[in-house]
Amino acid sequence: MAAQGFLLIATFLLVLMVLARPLGSGLARLINDIPLPGTAGVERILFRLPGVSDHEMNWKQYLCAILGLNMLGLAVLFFMLLGQHYLPLNPQQLPGLSWDLALNTAVNFVTNTNWQSYSGETTLSYFSQMAGLTVQNFLSAASGIAVIFAFIRAFTRQSMSTLGNAWVDLLRITLWVLVPVALLIALFLIQQGALQNFLPYQAVNTVEGAQQLLPMGPVASQEAIKMLGTNGGGFFNANSSHPFENPTALTNFVQMLAIFLIPTALCFAFGEVTGDRRQGRMLLWAMSVIFVICVGVVMWAEVQGNPHLLALGADSSINMEGKESRFGVLVSSLFAVVTTAASCGAVIAMHDSFTALGGMVPMWLMQIGEVVFGGVGSGLYGMMLFVLLAVFIAGLMIGRTPEYLGKKIDVREMKLTALAILVTPTLVLMGAALAMMTDAGRSAMLNPGPHGFSEVLYAVSSAANNNGSAFAGLSANSPFWNCLLAFCMFVGRFGVIIPVMAIAGSLVSKKSQPASSGTLPTHGPLFVGLLIGTVLLVGALTFIPALALGPVAEYLS
């Protein structure tokens, strides 16, 4: 089984790199503000109609444009969900959502989290799924990519104050990247058997003679961008373990590739735009090393079987609880690491049913900031924060002013970097503490003891880091949990974007210094090791006490 696991990982990474390389070249053109062939005329028309200016923006203007679009989207989606019963395409006559669930849902889709405190097939109409959630899947993904576009430009421009135009970037990302690729994935899913219709739910007779109501809907179109945009919110409650969303082993493989496709392509684009492709490869090596180790640990933990079942004398040579038999342990383990390394959160197995160590790894991947490939845009700018921190640490060790790609890293940048890195750990630890201190928080736990605490810790980690997956034993659809998680999602998203844009604004105004004999090389294996060590050190120091109370205590008990 070990050989099968390594072959699965190797095949996945090989196909991923082959697909991401050409996409990275296309993204590099967009970062360099070069329209794709044949698109300039369409862009001019689209900007002329609403009268949008395409002039360059400084970091504050760029940030305000991103925040303004997202706040508008949040308000529209919130009221759409409240008044769902007045809107069309609601064949099941589903009522509007409560204010707290509508708020939670609006925030989580705008922030690219897609935490779901509801069951899609019994809560949301087709109109809400399409015009509400799917639209935000595109816009939230485009927002994250636009931020990393601006951040990359900060390293390639010198003595300037502008970082591009947010509206131009958002339009190009959506029209020329997200929509075409999502369309191809959606057509493939439909060909493989995923649903795409507007029929009312179908009553069918089962082989046992009972009657069952099968949900319908425009599934494939939402499923495609859900994966490509690392959104993760399922059309159905079972998410990608549902055969109507993910019908075959081939669609499952394609969905995993879709999750990592843009984050990987952005690393290639980063190297191409900066004029040193080794920089992009350095990031990919660091991410890949952590990723492969994490997949190996989860696979090992899950093939050991469930120790609680073994203690009762049951046959549990592998842990199949909560897993689809058509996918199995190895594929489920790989998917779990893919979806939590990226800020996706889609699942084909119930993470709450993983072994203690098998469930701890996905939780820890979220807690370190979703920087191992990560979300579209957010993963790379999150990892770049650790790059700046690693450069700063190396500068202290050798007694030189830290610099990266020729840009001096001063006190202002390091303060903002520390602020951005500390946002999500603060939310996670304080949110988990608040939940455990209140009756409303503790009453949602399905399990007592360490596993119950793990459910709480996982939920807050998922929300604050904009992942969206869950230990589903937590009953999170209550005013307390909906509001707590909405706050964590909102601050976890925009509380990081704001200092990231401020760092970009500071760096773009600096001159690039030529490399000297004392410059730290940031493309070799030494720096890869330093970067991995920085990520692990920050993650270990921050979360080991909390993890010791949850999954570690469960493993040792």
From Swiss-Prot:
InterPro entries for the chain: KdpA
Superkingdom as given in the UniProt entry: Bacteria
A GO term, aspect molecular function: P-type potassium transmembrane transporter activity
Pfam family of the protein (one): KdpA
Subcellular location, principal: membrane
Keyword Transmembrane helix: yes
Coiled coil feature spans: none
Protein's UniProt keywords contain Nucleotide-binding: no
Cellular compartments annotated: Cell inner membrane
Membrane topology according to the record: Multi-pass membrane protein
Any one cellular-component term (Gene Ontology): plasma membrane
Residues passing through the membrane, by range: 5-25, 63-83, 132-152, 170-190, 253-273, 283-303, 329-349, 356-376, 379-399, 416-436, 484-504, 526-546
Residues annotated as signal peptide: none
Alphabetical UniProt keywords: Cell inner membrane, Cell membrane, Ion transport, Membrane, Potassium, Potassium transport, Transmembrane, Transmembrane helix, Transport
Family (UniProt): Belongs to the KdpA family.
Role: Part of the high-affinity ATP-driven potassium transport (or Kdp) system, which catalyzes the hydrolysis of ATP coupled with the electrogenic transport of potassium into the cytoplasm. This subunit binds the periplasmic potassium ions and delivers the ions to the membrane domain of KdpB through an intramembrane tunnel.
Record text on subunit structure and interactions: The system is composed of three essential subunits: KdpA, KdpB and KdpC.
Record's protein name: Potassium-transporting ATPase potassium-binding subunit
The organism of origin for this protein: Shigella boydii serotype 18 (strain CDC 3083-94 / BS512)
Lineage: Bacteria, Pseudomonadati, Pseudomonadota, Gammaproteobacteria, Enterobacterales
